[in-house]
Design a protein with these regions (language model features):
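Flexible "arm" and connector segments at domain edges
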Residues: 1-106
Length: 106
């Protein structure tokens, strides 16, 4: 037996059972769901950082979308927030690395 205690995609129980194994599943309440989504997004970021694979970014996007739904924020609303931040602060297109800040005389 392997213990997991992690949020999985909706079809994973069927995939496990199709492989001849059994699994125990718990349906989370809304508060638990957000907590486990937050853990999941960290997991997906780490998987992307380790592998560099675009497929991991797709997983990250899926978790991000689930968080938005759980927080009752539409993807369009989220995109407006993103664009507003780009308008005010820019994006990451110029590949700028801030090394230090200082005032005259420092």
């Amino acid at each position: 037996m392997i213990e997991y205690d992690k949020l999985v995609r909706d079809k994973i129980p069927e995939v496990i059972e199709a492989s001849g194994k059994k699994c125990d599943i718990e349906v989370l309440n809304d508060e638990q769901y957000i907590e486990y989504l937050n853990k999941k997004i960290k997991e997906e970021v780490n998987e992307y950082l380790e592998s560099g694979e675009i497929e991991e970014l797709a997983d990250l996007e899926e978790v991000l979308r689930a968080i938005l739904v759980a927080k009752k924020v539409s993807y369009d609303e989220f995109e407006k927030i993103r664009i507003s931040k780009v308008d005010k602060r820019g994006a990451f297109e110029k590949k700028l690395l801030l090394k230090r800040t200082y005032t005259d005389g420092e």
